[in-house]
Regions:
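Conserved N-terminal segment of class I S-adenosyl-L-methionine
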Residues: 1-104, 108, 131, 158-189, ...
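A conserved beta-strand element that flanks and buttresses the S-adenosyl-L-methionine
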Residues: 116
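Hydrophobic adenine-recognition pocket in adenosine-nucleotide-binding enzymes
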Residues: 120
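Histidine-centered divalent metal-coordination motifs
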Residues: 123
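A short glycine-rich, Lys/Arg-flanked "PGG" loop and its adjoining helix->strand segment in the class I
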Residues: 128-142
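Conserved class I S-adenosyl-L-methionine
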Residues: 143-165
Length: 212
């Protein structure tokens, strides 16, 4: 049976970002994705070797999941039920896509070597629960990226976007500065690296017992 559509929830703004006509937005997005690629390349420098099983939570149309699959063997990617996303997923052969909620991940504890969430946590009604779930199903690494506030909203205002909402992108329920996001992630994992590909914050963290 097909999963029911998610009503009243903003799935995200991935498509607008990846297909933007504005050359500045395209450039910033390319740099952000390159930063994620660099973070992925650092994983596996310990005795465990490269990750073998990877999960992306909130995968959108699958761009990041596809890049993950180019590096790692098994990639599972999930997002909320949405007909548009299902159409996008058909373009990618490698990752295994499914519908699920970040608040209740349908996997056993310690299932994945690395869990990735890129522009997801800001959308969650309960980000603490989402973070705990990612830590539960992960066994080694977390790679997490969110808009860096208040910079992200300021950029929207400068571009004349979402002015009536003071620059807040639709669906962004949570807002972190670089420092507050590091503090947030540190609840469940040891933060090893923080980068700031403008206007985002990206964190690589190691889960308890994730390195020998």
């Amino acid at each position: 049976m097909a999963a029911p559509e998610t009503v009243g929830v903003v799935i995200g703004n991935h498509t607008q970002k990846y297909t933007a006509r504005n050359p500045a937005i395209r450039l910033l997005t390319e740099r952000w994705v390159a930063n994620l690629d660099r973070a992925f390349g650092q994983l596996g420098g310990d005795a465990h070797g490269p990750p073998e099983q990877a999960l992306e939570v909130g995968c959108g149309e699958g761009v990041v999941a596809d890049r993950m699959h180019r590096r790692w063997g098994e990639v599972v990617a999930l997002d909320l039920p949405d007909a548009g996303l299902r159409a996008d997923w058909r373009r990618y052969r490698g990752p295994r896509f499914l519908h699920a909620s970040a608040h209740e991940l349908p996997f056993a504890d310690n299932r994945f070597d690395v869990v990735v969430a890129a522009e997801v946590l800001e959308h969650l009604p309960d980000p603490d629960r989402g973070l705990r779930e990612m830590a539960r199903v992960g066994r080694r690494h977390l790679v997490l990226s969110v808009p860096r506030e208040p910079v992200f909203r300021s950029c929207n205002l400068v571009a004349g976007r979402y002015v009536r909402d003071l620059g807040n992108t639709p669906g962004h329920l949570n807002h972190w500065s670089r420092r507050s996001f590091v503090r947030f992630v540190s609840q469940v994992a040891e933060v090893r690296e923080v980068t700031s590909p403008f206007p985002w914050t990206t964190v690589w963290a190691v889960l308890p017992g994730g390195e020998p």
